[in-house]
Amino acid sequence: MNSLVTFILPVYNAESTIYRCLDSILKQTYCDYEVIIVDDGSIDNSGKICDSYSLRDNRFRVVHTENAGVASARQLGVSLATGEYVIHIDSDDWIESNMLSDMMNEISDADILVSDYYYNTKHGQTYVRQVDCTTSEELLDKIIKGEVFGSLWHKLIRRNLYQNIEFNTDLTFCEDQLLLFKILTTYQCKVINLHKAYYHYECNDGSITQRTDREYFDNKIKYEDYALRVLSPLSFRYIRDIFVLDRLKSYSGPIQSKIYSNSEIKALVNRLPKPNVSMIRLKFVFVNQILFFIQILKAPVVIKKILVKVFRIIKVL
């Protein structure tokens, strides 16, 4: 008997894309799956569309809730899942018909399978290859370095890894990456890669990750604070230090757009722990130095002083 796989699908006002998403699940050649659809208070026809699929196929289950955000929707989906494995899918994305079949043929005794994926924009489609990993620490390291994407949607994960681990429901994005950090710092997982792409990640101009307003950066900072706590144990200090350096360079957005006041930017910098750069690869630090020089050249005088202080933190001694 084949193992059951659970799809978790949060939906909010997705009537323009949900048909394509649900049809791609329906076309899976691997038939032993269930779909937990959490309609997060949609005010368009998304909920009705999802209901129509549940009437057609009893593997589709729809739960309608008041709007509480994507993290709450994912958490509810996980709590209702009964499959041995779990994979997430977003309502504006879609998957190839052989995805589950190939993944289930490969996963064997592994805990997490990471596949490649397609990055789709209005300009075309790009194949994105993920770096090989075999352990929790390797996967965590590669995600923070940007060599593996941190989302859950191209990762098949054993459901028991979700036990006693919850999404941070006050996050509006990066909730899946933070959840993955928690799994990888809690369990010693066997990880394998499947170098085929099945998931089509649709990047559109209206997505929350394309925003640059204060709400976006506030959420990003909140995520960073949570992530630093997850990475605080001594055994993950090296990875945490890389995360700190990467976060420092990400402050270019609020600096250039003047979303935060000078005092707020200074507070952002000061709240980060000082990384031990002697443990970090010279190449990684050098890239961050170059990015800071660019920021310093463009920034106002007051911000220059703050950035120079930051640069001294990451300077190779």
Feature-to-residue mapping (PLM):
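N-proximal low-complexity "stem/linker" segments adjacent to membrane-targeting elements
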Residues: 1-24
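Short, acidic, metal-binding catalytic loop of nucleotide-sugar glycosyltransferases
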Residues: 23-32
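A conserved acidic beta->alpha catalytic loop
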Residues: 24, 39-49, 90
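Glycine-rich, basic loop-to-helix element that forms the pyrophosphate-binding segment
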Residues: 65-81
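Short aromatic/hydrophobic "clamp" motif used to bind/position activated sugar donors
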Residues: 86
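Conserved donor NDP-sugar-binding/catalytic core segment of glycosyltransferases
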Residues: 98-127
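Conserved nucleotide-sugar donor-binding catalytic segment
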Residues: 139-214
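Membrane-interface aromatic/basic loop that binds lipid-linked glycans or pyrophosphate carriers
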Residues: 255-317
